[in-house]
A protein has these predicted regions:
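Active-site cofactor/cluster-binding pocket
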Residues: 1-166
């Protein structure tokens, strides 16, 4: 987005990510951005690595916003310990809230690209397509920012996500 001339601000909250908790990252871009903080009901897009996290952050999404999520289910600690069950019907519930849902098997696409670690890039590809941005701009950014030995794998992961976002 910076290559398109936008002002971009980022904020991360790591919480207990080292112990299986979530990492929250807020990204804002526009002509002039004063703060990366996004209040409930203001996000255009929620991008999530798994269904429960997508549902958890749904209150941040504005009406008519887009949820881009991996279809993978990652059991949180209460489910792992048997204290709770993983909720069923999350994707349907997200759609029921009026969100435009883009759910894809990002894990399989990342494996197809060459590494399960590329799930994030697959999801970014799908998000980029939902934004209507040109694929080439993102591929050039990958070339500029990713270590050379991982460029082709990341470009493939991005492209697979971009195509799945159609």
């Amino acid at each position: 987005m910076m290559d398109l001339g936008y002002d971009v601000k980022v904020s991360e909250v790591h919480g207990m990510s080292q112990r299986g908790g979530s990492v929250e990252t807020y990204v804002r871009y526009g002509e002039k951005v004063y703060s990366p903080v996004i209040d409930p009901g203001e996000a255009d897009i929620v991008l999530a690595f798994e269904q429960l996290e997508a549902a958890r952050f749904l209150p941040f999404l504005k009406k008519g916003g887009v949820v881009v999520t991996n279809t993978q289910k990652i059991d949180p600690m209460p489910v792992v310990t048997g204290a709770a069950q993983y909720p069923q019907g999350l994707l349907e519930a997200i759609e029921g809230q009026g969100a435009r849902l883009l759910a894809l098997d990002a894990l399989s696409l990342a494996e197809q690209a060459g590494s399960v670690k590329a799930v994030n890039v697959v999801l970014i590809g799908a998000m980029a397509k939902s934004l209507g941005t040109e694929k080439e701009i993102w591929l050039k950014t990958i070339e500029k920012t990713v270590p050379p030995k991982f460029v082709e794998m990341n470009k493939k992961a991005f492209t697979l996500g971009y195509e799945a976002g159609e």
